[in-house]
Design a protein with these regions (language model features):
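Extracytoplasmic copper-binding redox domains, predominantly the cupredoxin/blue-copper superfamily
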Residues: 19-131
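Sec-dependent bacterial lipoprotein signal peptides
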Residues: 1-18
């Protein structure tokens, strides 16, 4: 009887852990990086989270010389995303699997609309203003 109670207790703990653990940040992505709407590391480093087939935030303003890092915060097993400027040649990340990152430093001011190549038709678009 005592052994049965120990087994049931262990199973209950495992179920509770599985149900209440935080799985939202994807493998390798830190919880701080995946905060929505944006994480500002310091005045020159910004994080944009890719989650639920959207950029968070979908519009961001940064100073000239700032670095923006896009982090795929989807759960493991969800499709990969890109961050690609609407103007060819400015930037085009590879496919970012959950937990992956892509960074770019912006040395020229301007307005830069961008999108996710596989999910543009689903409305996965963003805008970066460098001022």
């Amino acid at each position: 009887m005592k052994r049965l109670m120990m087994v049931l207790g262990a199973v209950g703990c495992a179920i509770a852990l599985a149900c209440f653990s935080d799985r939202s940040s994807g493998p390798g992505a830190g919880a701080a990086e995946c905060r929505v709407p944006v994480t500002v590391i310091d005045s020159m480093h910004y994080i944009v989270a890719l989650r639920n087939f959207a950029f968070h935030p979908d519009s961001i303003a940064v100073p000239v010389g700032a670095t923006v890092t896009w982090v795929n915060c989807e759960d493991a097993g969800v499709e990969a995303h890109t961050t690609t400027s609407d103007t060819t040649g400015i930037w085009d990340s590879p496919l970012l699997i959950p937990g992956a990152r892509f960074s770019r430093r912006f040395s020229t001011g301007g307005v830069y609309p961008y999108h996710c190549i596989p999910h543009r038709d689903l409305g996965m678009v963003g805008k970066l203003v460098v001022q």
